[in-house]
């Protein structure tokens, strides 16, 4: 459960991401594909090379979903319901992949905003992406 301080930290951190969200989403995906090659199996139709327009496009989708989650931080299950349905019923993504992408996103944010990535902010963002992952996997049951 996100505390009021966590919510403040998440919103402040995401505000600093600003217009770079899509780029960071793509970078996190590239990081995931390189670090965890089995995740590529969900994207057989993608050009997974560095700078690929398909990876950039999906990175923007990831970032947009996170922006939605930040904007509806008190009601993420409702805000992400359609996305949860998509991943559970159509795409059938293994839930462990959300954790892998979450880790890669945190690394990406830490690389781009090292001064802002304090232990407290790191903990808050980790709890946030874990909450998003929980919401996205909630329809698997």
Curated annotation (Swiss-Prot):
Function: Involved in oxygen transport from the lung to the various peripheral tissues.
Tissue: Red blood cells.
Gene: HBA
Matching InterPro entries: Globin, Globin-like_sf, Globin/Proto, Hemoglobin_a-typ, Hemoglobin_oxygen_transport, Hemoglobin_pi
Family note: Belongs to the globin family.
Protein name, entry field: Hemoglobin subunit alpha
Residue numbers bearing the Phosphotyrosine modification: 24
Sites of N6-succinyllysine modification: 7, 11, 16, 40
A GO CC term assigned to this protein in UniProt: haptoglobin-hemoglobin complex
PANTHER family attached to this UniProt entry: HEMOGLOBIN FAMILY MEMBER (PTHR11442), HEMOGLOBIN SUBUNIT ALPHA (PTHR11442:SF48)
Binding, heme b: 87
Modified residues (Phosphothreonine): 8, 108, 134, 137
Record carries keyword Phosphoprotein: yes
Residues recorded with modification N6-acetyllysine: 16
Keyword Transport: yes
Domain Globin, first and last residues per copy: 1-141
Gene Ontology biological-process annotations: hydrogen peroxide catabolic process
Phosphoserine modifications at: 3, 35, 49, 102, 124, 131, 138
Gene3D superfamilies, per database record: Globins
Keywords carried by this UniProt record: Acetylation, Heme, Iron, Metal-binding, Oxygen transport, Phosphoprotein, Transport
UniProt: O2 binding residues: 58
Assembly, per entry: Heterotetramer of two alpha chains and two beta chains.
